[in-house]
Every structure is written in C-alpha cells, then in structure tokens.
C-alpha cells in the first residue's frame, strides 16, 4: 500500500527535508480533521506522538492531571496502569507524556517495529477512550483528594500531581518563570499554570476535569507525528480504521490567542519561601523580560538564541559582566523561551536585593545602548552561531531519540500554523543568513527594537520570605480544620470510608485477564548478544591511548583522563572548583570571554568533568579521573588541541575578582540543582557513609565548601589560589594521563599528531604519590531546606556482606521501581517518583522524589526483603520484567556514548564475556532468582544508612531518626 492509495487522508505537502536527509509529509484526516506530520528516513529509532492543544483557563492543573490519568487504563487496555506495564514490558527507547503551557503530548519510541505498534495502540486508546469516566478514583489518586484516616485525625490533601507541583513551587527558579509568563501574557492562557498551583488544584471538580477531556481530546484538535524507518501508509491505515475514522470533525476553538501589546512595561513582585536560617539579604531575583514577535518567524527564533549567548550566557558576555561588576547578583542568566506562541527574552539576576531594581534596569539599558552604538563583538556572535549549528548538525540529545526532539520542535510552529510543522527543523539556510548578518548591524537593530524600545515588557521581582511555606501550610491546616468542622457526622463517616475505599482500590491489582490484554513481545524477540566494546590500545610518546573505532560523522571526540586518586581526601571538593575555573579565567593569549568565543568558533565545546569508575570486584577500589573533553570536526582538531593546551597550562588562577565571581555563581547554580535533584543529592550522600568512590560525587560537601569560600573569601583566597595551582601541576602530568578517542580509523593520525605536541607540555610528577585515604563515616543526616516535599534515601553495600553481583539485580530494579516502590510510595503515598540502583561494586540505594512522607517511606523500604521473599511471577510476568530490563540495557547510543561506554569498561576492567554473562542471566532469569536476592537486600537495609533532604518542619518533627538534622545552608551562617 502507498500513501496515495489512502482514501481517508488528504496529502497537503510532500517534499524533501534536505537538512535532515529525510522526506517530510503533511496530511489531514478527512473525516475527523486530525493533523499528521511525517518525517520519513532510515533511522530505526522510530518515534510517534499524539498531542493536543490544551489551553487552561485556570491554575487547577486540569491539563496536567489529564496527562497523568488517561494513562491509567482504557477501554481496550483496562489495567490500572498501562504506562507502567509498558515500561516494565516493552523495548521502548522513550515512553512518557508531557504537559506544556498550552499543549499536551504523548510520545513513544522503539527500534522494534512490533513493539512500536503495540505502544502506539496503547497510547491511542488511552487518549481517546480512557477509564477516567468509569473510575473517579483515578482522578483522586493522580489529581487530588481529601484524606481522613479516623474521626480524630486531621483532614489532609494528597495526590500525585498535587505533591509534584508542591515540589515545583518550592524552587524559586520555577516560581520566577511562572511569574514571568503571567506578567507578560495576563489576558491569555499563558497567565495560568498548566501544571497546577497547589493552592488551586483542590478547586478542580471531577466534572470540570471530565469536561476538559471531552472538549479537547478530539482528533480535530490533535497533532499526530511519525518519524523514522517504517511503513507510513500501513500505520496511517491502522489509525484510520482503529480510531480516527470513528470521529466526525467538530467546530472546536482551541486557538492560542495573541496577547495585546502593552502600552507600557509592567512590574510584578512575588514572594517565595526560604528556610528559617536563610538570610533574606542577597536572596532576591530580579528579571527584565520582553516579548519577541511570534514563534513563526524562523530568523528571530534562532537570532535570539544567538543573542542570548552573546549578551548573557557566554562567559564574560557584556550584559552578564556589567551586572556582576555593578555588584548586582552572583549569577546572571539569560532566558530565551521559544516554546510558546510569543517567545520571551529575559535577563535574570539571582541572589540580589529588591532595592537594586532601578540600578539593575539602568545597567541593562546603558549596556544595551552602548552595544547598539559601538557594535557587538563579532566573534561572540560567530561563536554563538557556530555553537548552535554544531549542536544542530550533531543532533546528540543524550538518551532522548533525536526524532522525539525534532517532533517537539515541530510544535513550536505547527501548533500555530497547520502547514508549517517543519519550519524550525530546516535551519541551515537561517544559519547562513545569520552568519552573513554578523558584519551588518542586524543584531544591534534587534536589540534596539525588541530589548530597548519594546513596551511589551515586564520587571518581575521574586523576594524571599522566611517560613512562607510553614505559613501556607498553617493556613491550609486551618482551612481543612474548618472544612472538617463543617461536616456532619455522616459526612465524616463517608470521608473516612472514601479514604479507606481509595486505599483498597489502589491495593487491588488488575485482574490477570486485563493484564494479558496489554500487547507484549516474547523472550525470543530480544537480542541475545550484548553490544560490543570498541577498545584498541596504542601508545603515543609513552602515554596510553584507547581508540574507539566508530563511525562519527566526521567528528573526533577526544578526552584526556588524568588520574586524581592521589589528591588528599580533604581536597576532593576543590576538584569541583578547579573544574569550574578552567576555561572560565583569562589565559596567556585570551581573556576568558575571548577564550569561550574561540572554543565555540572552532569546536563543539571544551569541558571538564570528574569521572569515577568503581571496581566491579572490590567495594573499596576505584579509579577517579579529571577528564578534559572536546569534540571537533577533523580539520578543526588542531585548534581544539591548541585551546586545550592554552586552558590547562596558561590559566590565570591568581585573578581573585574572577575567582570570587566563579565561586558565587557556582554556589547559586548548586542551590538550584539541590532543590530540583534532591533525590540524587540524598542518595549520593547516603552512599558516602560507606563508599569511598561516592566521596567524589558528594554535592553537599561541595556545596558547604562553596558556601564557606564565598562567605570568607578574603581570608581563604590566598590558600585557595595556592591549592588550585598545586592541583594543576600535580594532576596534569604525563604519568597521570590516559587518552580516549572516538572516531573512525582515518581520524586517528590527526589525534596522534596533536598528542605528540601536547604531551611534552605536561608537568613533571614530583616525588612519590599515594592514594587518598578516604574514611567513610555513617552519619544519618537530615538536611532542611525551604522545599514543601522530601527526598528520602536509604543505602548500603551488598559486597560488604559477602554477596556478589548478579544480572537479576537489573530485573529487581524494574520490579522495585514499577511495582513495589511505585505502588506504595507513588500510588498510595502520593510521591512523584521513586528510584533504586545496584552497582557492580555493591553500592545500593533506594530514594523517593517529591515525597510528602518520611517515616512511612522509610517503613516501605524496610518492607522490601519481605516483598522479595514472597515474590511470585508466572512466565508472562517474568518475561515482561525481562523485556523492560533489556529495554533499559539497549538504549540506542550515539558515537560519543558508545565511546564512553567502551572506555568505562576499559577502566573498570570489565570484559565482554562478563557483560554477556550478565545479559544471559537477565534473559534466563526466573522468579527463584529474584527471591534469591532477599538476603542480599536485607543486609543492605540492615545497615540503616539514611539521608533525607527537604521540608524543614517534617525533618524537625522526625529528629529522632537521624544522627544530625541541620540546615543545608548552615555553613553560611
């Protein structure tokens, strides 16, 4: 069958998308009005999504709650959580759903055609025929509900989205971005919080929620996307027959309206909560925000991305530097948001004070006027363009399929113009245009028009308030107490019964016959062989080099790995400071701003990272490297190598002013990452109680070090510069160096030539070195911050108790994450997420994410061994868990990821036979293998290593669980 044979569809456009080496097709389903965009090519990582325009009219989070709930069972697949069943039992390379300010999308991806069809089928049924109309419990569980355990207990509110958004509203960055949207678009859907404001989520009724689904989840309001190597005609014929052909187009107005421009800029002040020990001084956020036309201007869409780099984001960018030099804020960021109908551009100063507002605005205006008059730095513009174009051509989105990112980008134009889904994907002509404009005043005129003369602008101030969370919680408790007091005895009994009923509903598993309706692959569909390693050893001037011979599309990925095991334990946090300094201070030939421009003009970037490689046999053995990475086109590698030498051997570490700026900015960034990634912070900290390797990844010690350095900089600066210089000369030596290269064979000679010039410049190793003495100490800490939720972590090491690693642990991870922990911590407990991990060196952790509970979650962890002991699974269930595990193991890799995986195996001394053995253990696993892990996990939990990050009041109330409870910012005081 061919596309032209499909009578149900009208082909609106079919043409090559040369920039992506693909064919683009735009179609409309005649009967239902559904829109379809196809990007057809030879990529076997196929992507599908169905999306809807979902403009909210309030901040109850209705669009977000629907996104969660349509994946809780449907007509054809009536299980309670088909999403989880698919995660456990499919070979998906991506599976999720996302709510944006005015759209909701349901994407899936898979390299297996049968699996891809299964996933499409479940998702199409979920959005069009969800069980939400049959079971109000789904709305209560995922959205919100009142809870009352007994007549004497207080009424509380729980729900997954409710708790997720309590976590989101704990972050000042999130609060600021929401206030910017509200300030600039007060009369449009963007003024509302599509994710839901916890204050307003409980205002949403079940009927209003169903009405929203009825209104917007119709094919005529849908956007269907297909990408990759597939029989497009077959997929479209199936969609027509199974779903779209059953609907008639209706008159539905979901158009996103433009905000009428302002007559003058407006100002908004809003509060956010800080903990009782944080200072209100230097904790305000100031932002200046403007609206930039519409997302349908492809030149402006990219030009402001470049201006973001040239003005604010690049090291030493003029607007950033002017504000820092004026003493306004410790971190200056730019925010160009092109994912809405009217893109916005923001300049944000973090960690400043409200009285600096006029000064902040004056510095912005003076700096921008100076740039318009005297011209922008041409190299800075070129660097921004080249960096953006390199990323576009490389299309490396980490573990996200590139087809998914292309599909999401389609909606930046498609949502507002049915005929232009590919507008922003065809970017090479725009890059050429922008390069030509560098020598003109094009960019300066954009500054004049959109940043200086633009009345459609706002100033948003986010001020800290101590104990605001506690005040809001007290107000909520009072409101709930009044609500309870207004209930009759019968109503109280009903609420207790409803609470009990919901728990019973959550505890009742889906019937086996329903579970069997979820389509699933067989064990025979799985690839038996593990992915190969690509390691060839050679030597250049006595330095070991490992070459990963992989097709890399003309790019060389080069990593210099310097051993740092000799760095004393007390100096480990300073490795993070060194990493932040290199490339961000002046060098012999460049200011740090010029250095950044040179890097971005000639390469895909130069970065540093700390790589930790635990032994797979010995829990106390590990390798740790200071890694300096670059990527460049073959003909640009000489420039990349020259810039690496410049950075490593001529950086000016004596510049105290610059050093202070870097430390203050780094501390500010770390604050944000602690609030957004508290699960990672807590689990790593818990592992430092017993694991030497974990000490190198401990965010909290690093954060405390930065707080101390910032607060006492004048006393510490001499010792700090001396320490950093000593580190440079002791780390960057020939004896410490190991080189990793990912490219085809024909690129290797280019690398060897550059290494021959690089190696003689390395420092000499002075004297004998011994490995750092790291002595883990069990502390069991609670770290209080201004969050409304918690991140609860338990950890231990099974090798310490004589147990060996087994492939079945990979399956246990899936079982825990999507059965035991999911049901108890997320479904019943209301947390947004839960994770667990089992390393080959024995390090093990369990952690919750945006969790309202502490003691209850800890008790759930204690129940894991009993769950494993009683674990039963028939052949179908075991196969499902195994498929989900293999899906995790077989995530498609780009060239750099293949190289990194091969290098990690080399450093950890993992043979191909060992990973094949692990894969065989996974594919051949039985329920007995899972039950056999009971004693291992019991031994880990018996260590009782507990670390919790989060809500101040909850941690204080549970102080007895910890050795110490303290504020995250304690070292600042």
Give the location of each predicted region.
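M16 family metallopeptidases and their MPP-like homologs
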Residues: 45-55, 81-129, 136-147, 174-199, ...
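His/Glu-based metal-binding/catalytic segments typifying zinc-dependent metallopeptidases
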Residues: 40-42, 49, 162, 166, ...
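Non-catalytic, conformational "gating/processing" segments within enzyme and secreted inhibitor domains
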Residues: 158, 210-242, 720-755, 942
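Extended, regular secondary-structure scaffolds
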Residues: 211, 223, 232-251, 374, ...
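Hydrophobic, small-residue-rich alpha-helical packing segments that form membrane-like cores
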Residues: 150-219, 225-243, 247-274, 280-282
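Generic recognition of flexible, low-complexity loop/linker segments
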Residues: 94, 210-214, 273-276, 319, ...
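Active-site His/Glu-centered metal-binding helix of metallohydrolases
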Residues: 62, 66-70, 578
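Non-catalytic terminal extensions that flank enzyme cores
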Residues: 1-47
